[in-house]
Structure formats: C-alpha cells, structure tokens
Curated annotation (Swiss-Prot):
The protein's name in its UniProt record: Histidine--tRNA ligase
InterPro entries in alphabetical order: aa-tRNA-synth_II, aa-tRNA-synth_II/BPL/LPL, Anticodon-bd, Anticodon-bd_dom_sf, His-tRNA-ligase, HisRS-like_core, HisRS/HisZ, HisRS_anticodon
EC number: 6.1.1.21
Gene: hisS
Pfam families found in the cross-reference section: HGTP_anticodon, tRNA-synt_His
Length: 408
C-alpha cells in the first residue's frame, strides 16, 4: 500500500471544516486592519532563500533542479517571496502596502506534535511604514488574530538592538553563534560559548539582560541607544491599545533578516513546540533589486494553532438535509434539492439506488432532517419534512421548509 510521505497529513472533512472556520475568522480580522490577501508561487529561485534566510532554514529546504538547469526550492517561508513579489509587482502601489496570505510551506525537519514537513501558514507583511505606529499595528494584528481564533497564549516582545548593543565588540561569527543559541532558548550554551572565547566579562550582563522584563531594566544594563525613543513609543502605543505582553530581550529569531523589533507568541498545551507566531521588523527589498524599504510582519503556524485549540474550535451548525424519494418522485426531488441549495441549505440525494427504508437509515446517520417525497407530495406540490432528532414531521411547501431551515 502506498502511504503519504513522512511529515505530511491527510485531512478528513470534519478537520477541514474546523480549519476553514478558523481561517475565515483570521481572514476577516486581517481585512478589518486593511490587509488584503495575496498568493505567491509554491517554488521559487533557490537564491531567493539563500541570500538572507539563515543557516537553519537553508539546511532544511527542499531543493531541486528543473529541466532547464535552474536551481529551485519549495518555499520554506513566505516573507522573502512576498518581498520579491513587492519588488517585481508592487513598488508603484501606495505606501504602506498591507498584504496577508495563507500558504503551504515546506521544510525537511523531524516531524513531531504540531510540526510537519508540509505546513500551513498565515502571514501578514506591512511594507513601507518606518514608524513605531507601524511596528505596533503589526504586533496588535498578530495578537488580535490569535485572540479571534480562540487560542490561549502569551505575547513576548524584544528588540534586536538590545542584544546587538551588548555584543557590539564581538566578531560577526561569534555574534551569530550567540544569536543561534538564544533563538533555541539555550541561554546556558550561550554563556558557555562566551567563556570559551574568553569573554567572561559578558556573561553576567547577558544573564541579566536575558532576565530583564522592563525597559528600565534593559536600559540600565545596555545604556541608552539610538533606538530608545522609538522603542519606548512603540510600547506606549501597545499599552494604550490594551495589548498584554512580556518584554523579552533574549528573542533572537531564526531568520537573519530581522533588524529591529521582534516578537513571538507561545500557546499553552503544546510542550516544547509551543511557539505559534513569530515576526518582527526587517529590510529585504533591496536584496531583490528594489529600494531599501522598511517592513514588518509575522507568520502564524496554523497547524500548531489547531493543535492548541483542540476541540475548542467549532464550526457553526448548519442543518443537513437528505431527500428520500421513490422513483416516481425523483424529478420533483431534484427540483426541491436545487431550491434548497440555492438558499444555502446543505442537501443530499440518494446516489446509490437504495430502497426507501435504506435511504431513511442512511439519513439517520448523517442528516438532521429528511425531506420525504412520494406520490402524494408530487401531486400536491408539497414535501414531508421530518426532524430526525426530534422524530416529528409535517407536510409543508418547499418555501415553508426553506424558511424553517434557514432560520434554524
């Protein structure tokens, strides 16, 4: 038997309905902030991702060569493709550009709870707004989307200038190592590395900075920095908006293109793989042939959102109807089915030439109502509507049934 590839999933109708409901909530919420949905190719030129994505992601990419000898990759993330699209298609648009997307991404990593090799992401990118207000809106949108989805989570915010200032006199390679440790939340490994390279003087400040939870504590450790006024303004805007958050200077992010504010959200009940959102401010457009354009955005791991929701996610109830008929009532039944569907009622008819009793038995397993059509219903232009849960039935017109079912 041929099975699905490791790290992928099949999703049956119940799961897909739950997912589509949460997606719809998130799409609608993003639209309220002025973000419009876009789509990019599933595969891109390999160079798009090797320019600035970070070693961890580069090593996990699905890479192939096409028949023309071009090196291509299945997208491991969406920010780089979106900025490539902006440079190629959207530079003439009014700023700021507000785009969002749902899309599959692909990474060759070890599958585990909430982590797959093919995974579904929601993301949003704000392009061309270089302000504390812009940074705050992106964070607020991310928070609002998860809240709307029904997830219980914690929002943590940092700024790369905090750690960049503390580690300013380290070699670039050493900075990268420290950032990689912090991104994996391995602070002890970062301390050990500093000792190994003879920088014991940075160990205590790093420990204190990683543990700082107020801006006052942060600036007491690193001193005032050029970004201080904007950082304070951004947090003041979040406070005014009523957004709950924790300050965490240790946030590093695994992608090499972030330049300023960074933020992450962590859900309850997911164990070690509990990060469901990550984002920040970045500059990428100039790497793809455009102008140096300030941007900010985030991605939500939608699969982890669904795991975090568990059975808490719900699909609005809609009555389901099965039409039960004899051969002489078939044409009339098809007309009724068409009328029901035109009015948004989920309606099925028998496709297996079953007997009347077998049709009723099947309806009892999958439907909420049975519409019974026999010789009498055809002659009188009516239907018999049976509530399969209550066991009651009544003979009414199709219009009356539609009114009853659409108001249920």
């Amino acid at each position: 038997m041929i099975q699905k590839p490791r790290g992928t999933r099949d999703m049956l109708p119940d799961e897909m309905e739950r997912r589509r409901e949460i997606e719809a909530r998130m799409r609608a919420r993003a639209r309220l902030y002025g973000f419009r949905e876009i789509a990019t190719p599933v595969f891109e030129e390999l160079e798009l991702f090797t320019i600035r994505s970070g070693e961890g992601i580069i090593n996990e990419m699905y890479v192939f060569e096409d028949k023309g000898g071009r090196s291509l990759a299945l997208r491991p993330e969406l920010t780089a493709p979106v900025l490539r699209m902006y440079v190629e298609e959207g530079r003439s648009l009014n700023k700021p550009v507000k785009w969002c997307y749902f899309a599959d991404c692909f990474r060759y990593e070890r599958p585990q709870k909430g982590r797959y090799r093919q995974f579904w992401q929601f993301g949003a990118e704000l392009i061309g707004a270089d302000s504390a207000m812009g940074d705050a809106e992106v964070i607020t949108l991310g928070y609002d989307l998860l809240r709307t989805a029904g997830v219980t989570f914690v929002l943590r915010i940092g700024h790369l200038s905090f750690m960049r200032t503390l580690l300013a006199d380290l070699a670039d390679g050493d900075k990268k190592k420290i950032r990689a440790f912090l991104d994996k939340r391995e602070e002890e490994a970062a301390i050990t590395y500093l000792r190994d390279i003879g920088r014991d003087d940075l160990c205590d400040p790093l420990i204190r900075l990683c543990g700082a939870r107020t801006l006052e504590d942060v600036f007491a450790i690193i001193g005032e920095i050029p970004e201080a006024a904007r950082v304070r303004e951004m947090f003041a805007i979040l406070d005014a908006s009523g957004i709950p958050y924790e300050i965490n200077p240790a946030i590093a992010r695994g992608l090499d293109y972030y330049t300023g504010v960074v933020f992450e959200c962590f859900a309850e009940g997911l164990g070690a793989e509990n990060q469901i959102l990550g984002g920040g401010a970045y500059r990428l457009a100039h790497l793809f042939g455009g102008e140096d354009t300030p941007s900010a955005g985030f991605a939500i791991g939608f699969d982890r959102v669904m795991v975090a929701l568990g059975e808490a996610s719900w699909v609005p109830w809609q009555p389901q109807v099965m039409i039960i008929t004899t051969n002489e009532g078939r044409d009339y039944a098809l007309t009724i089915a068409g009328q029901f569907r035109m009015n948004g009622i989920i309606t099925e008819t028998d496709l297996m030439d079953r007997s009347f009793s077998a049709q009723m038995k099947a309806a009892g397993k999958s439907a909420d109502y049975a519409v019974i059509i026999g010789k009498d219903e055809v002659e009188t232009g009516t239907i018999t509507l049976k509530d399969l849960k209550a066991g009651t039935q009544e003979k009414i017109t199709a219009d009356e049934a539609i009114q009853k079912l659409t108001s249920a």
